[in-house]
Design a protein with these regions (language model features):
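N-terminal low-complexity/intrinsically disordered extensions
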Residues: 1, 19-20
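Alpha/propeptide regions of enzymes that mature by internal proteolysis
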Residues: 20-353
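Bacterial N-terminal signal peptides
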Residues: 2-14
Length: 353
């Protein structure tokens, strides 16, 4: 049966098929004991990203490139150390993303971009591929590490997504660190906002100097996906959103199935790029669905979904890992800050195409 026909039927509503019509594996075949899972998944895997966009070697100084690479290496090392100890993929992805959130070079946490009114609002999500449990937070103004609050929402709130004041009140109740808005101020992000404001003023005929605006001035995201020694997948994503966004705007990062998704049966995905397009394309879940229902490989599914984003008019990229440890890192921009652990345990970081 054509896989796209199956997907169309599946999305139309609950239908019942004979087992041989779809050739889906039985639940008994999918379930394994912990010992069996450990034997089958001796290796671990980790992939990270620090955002995709207009990243050109000619526009980045050697010093700045070293700083980006060092930040990628720190995030990768933090997550990999956890996996090497036999701990969970959830712990590894959270740890890697926290490193990004503490680094002013990346658009998450400390390095979050500014809204149109000069404030910082952050989104994050985390998902457990073993249980399909997920936690997401949005429009945060005072949370130092949004990814940790997202995990707390998943594990203690009884909800999947919380935002704004309610999410921050929940954080206070549970000992999550809050900071003043001035903590998130960085000259580079403030200057990016001023460049965009000046360009807008120039376009509307109000004078002002026309300045070159790049994707890096506008947006960015960080994320991690991991496979642990128990065969469990996880994904985590965090972002400051888009420079000059309206207060209250929420992108794809905290939308489960769009910017963040994990399912042990298929893969874990974290996306970066034009959030509105990634939401409309349900990027994370679509990669999983193409693998589950169409039998595509991880790389085929990831590229197919990114091609769909491009057809809609969006740019960006994604990172993904499947239950066998295969990885995919496609992007349709000039660069994406990224890293992964190779089969020999070597940490690899890359920036350009």
């Amino acid at each position: 049966m054509n896989c796209f026909f199956v997907l169309a039927l599946f999305s139309a509503g609950p239908l019942v098929f004979a087992q041989d019509q779809l050739a889906l594996p039985s639940a008994a075949n999918e379930l394994r004991s912990d010992d069996q899972r450990k034997m089958q998944n001796e290796k671990v895997g980790l992939v990270i990203h620090g955002g995709a966009g207009t990243i050109e070697r000619s526009k980045i100084t050697p010093e700045r490139e070293r700083e980006y690479r060092a930040g990628l290496e720190r995030a990768l090392a933090a997550g990999y150390e956890i996996l090497k100890r036999g701990e969970s993929s959830l712990d590894a992805t959270e740890a890697a993303v926290r490193v990004f959130e503490d680094d002013p070079h990346f658009n998450a946490g400390k390095g979050a971009v500014f809204t149109s009114v000069g404030t910082n609002e952050m989104d994050a999500a985390i998902m457990d591929g073993k249980t399909l449990n997920a936690g997401a937070v949005a429009a945060l103004k005072h949370i130092k590490n949004p990814v940790s609050l997202a995990r707390l929402v998943m594990e203690r709130s009884g909800h999947v997504m919380m935002d704004g004041e309610g999410a921050e009140a929940f954080a206070k109740e549970n000992g999550i660190e809050l900071v003043d808005q001035k903590y998130f101020y960085t000259p580079e992000r403030w200057d990016a906002l001023q460049k965009i404001k000046a360009a807008e003023k120039n376009r509307t005929g109000g004078g002002g100097k026309g300045l070159a605006i790049t994707d890096q001035d506008r947006h960015g995201t960080v994320g991690a996906v991991a496979l642990d020694a128990h065969g469990d997948l996880a994904a985590a994503t965090s972002t400051g959103g888009t420079t000059n966004k309206r207060p209250g705007r929420i992108g794809d990062s905290p939308v489960i199935g769009a910017g963040t998704y994990a399912n042990n049966a298929t893969c874990a995905v974290s996306a970066t790029g034009d959030g509105e397009y990634f939401i409309r394309a349900t990027v994370g879940h679509d990669v999983s669905a193409l693998m589950e229902y169409c039998g595509m490989s991880l790389k085929e599914a990831a590229q197919s979904v990114l091609d769909k984003v491009a057809r809609l008019g969006g740019t960006g990229g994604l990172i993904a890992i499947d239950r066998e440890g295969n990885i995919a890192l496609p992007f349709n921009t000039s660069g994406m800050y990224r890293g992964y652990v190779d089969p020999n345990g070597k940490l690899v970081v890359e920036i350009y195409k």
